[in-house]
Amino acid sequence: MIIQDHQKGRTMQDYHKQLTEKEVKQFVNERFLEVKSSEKIKELVTFQAMNKYLIMAHNQEELRVLGRIVASNKKRKLSEIMIDYENNLKLALQSKPTIKTHSNVLMHCFGFFSKEFSDLEKEKFFDLLTDYKNEKITIGKILAEIHPIVYRFNKTYLAGQTYFLLYSNPEQGNIFKILEIDKTKK
């Protein structure tokens, strides 16, 4: 998926490492406006699912509120739901992600494939997480390491997360390259 920067005519891949929180918020808000203009609850449900981890990194409590707003679709008018959702999305995005909130998201992602990991893969994951918590690597680096795992284990729910799209550094290596190198050394 390539994100177009309409003002500059470039793709986000051209300056992926330079994404600011402002640009992340702008991207999410623009996608929400598309959902709102569609006037379809299905689009809002999809938006909520695709942005779950990104919103979680910003504000976990607002993520819960947004989930309840989406779930109220059988009891309320869509126009009311969209207004409430938009207001709470703005509240959620006002909170800046921290190492702690990103670490929480990473642990949620880990839960998707932890049972399928070998002991060595688990160890490598936790080494990366520790490096991130100790500010030795960036969130972009650790996500670039994890992202290929999503495809290896066919975790389509994670593959569609904007969290990976907006925060990872796609040109980085990954944990499987490290493991392959380790295997060839033995």
Question: Model-flagged regions — what are they?
Answer:
Residues I2-K186:
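Acidic, Ser/Pro/Thr-rich low-complexity regulatory regions
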